[in-house]
Amino acid sequence: IARPRGIINGVDMLYSGEVRKVRADAINRRLNDGELVLVAPLGYSATGEIFNLTHEEVATDVAISIEANKLIYLGEESGLKDKKGALIKELTTSFIKKQLINSINEPAQKRIWRNLIKASENGVDRIHLVDRKINGGILLELFTHEGIGTMLSRDPLEKIRAATLEDIGGILS
């Protein structure tokens, strides 16, 4: 379900909309039946108007609503790169909020990162950014140790801590 964006800075956004509500029950019912669910970036208002939605917002809100563990975002690039051009493999939400979001100048990129932060802060454990132009990119990201994109999570994935008695079985095996 969608609502109109309205007038922003004196510009009528016409048929551009925002996600108002996701019917998670309907999506989960289909997923539980073993079906693949494709969600288009279109939304309908309560009065039947059709609105164009951003795919980032739709993906984020659907992932949050269905309590997804992962969100995979296929974009124009394979993730975030450092100043030398090397791919950054892992980032935390807090790092992005403190260090990165204010340095992004391009509105589309800022919108993407704001949506990814929103997903992370609302229960999506891992968000992967993968280059849509790489053949087999999703498989390479998910099923190789290094992956090919950038992964965002609330907390660092690798935490160093002292071993406990419960860890002995895993250490010895």
Where are these regions (language model features)?
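C-terminal catalytic "cap/lid" subdomain
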Residues: 1-172
